[in-house]
Amino acid sequence: MQIPSINPGCGLALCASLALLVVALPAAAVIVDDSTDAMATLAPTKGAAASGTASFKSAGKDGMRIELELSGLEPGSVHGLHVHEKGDCSAPDATSAGPHFAVAGQQHGSLQGDNHHAGDLGNVTADSGGKAKASLVVPSSKMTLASGPLSVVGRAVVVHAAPDDLKSQPAGNSGARIACGVIDRETVGGGKAPMKPATN
């Protein structure tokens, strides 16, 4: 009878412990690939009351779907909405998020234009209760969930105090920033994956 060989570098007790450790790894620790959804939790800037969430999901060949829910707005008010270059909402007025996310040659404008900033998302309007919802699809030629210069991950979504006029440079005359949230990728089982810095 042939006796099975035993790996001299791994005693039975040690090997069994390692096997249990691998099996016990939580699903939330698994980082998913570039197609995974991302989200942002928006918090009010100093003196403001607006807050909410924004989700970023693949819309297949159409690009990326953005869904936004806000509260704490003035009833009937209209607000500019943009993705900003830096994933940093630490400043009291959110100026740490930098300018609108854009690639070389783009100018501020409306979603219907061909050469608007990648981060131009138009306006949202609050209802009688001060809440607002928006759902829009952004083509992959503007922004994407995948890694690279067009990635939305690691940037910030910002709500402004005034409407975006969709033409004034560089930001549509949309006023102060009243809410800001960093866009993070999610992980399997919930939670947040370590943020991969966006690259321009």
Question: What do these predicted ranges mean?
Answer:
Residues 2-3, 21, 25-200:
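N-terminal leader/targeting pre-sequences
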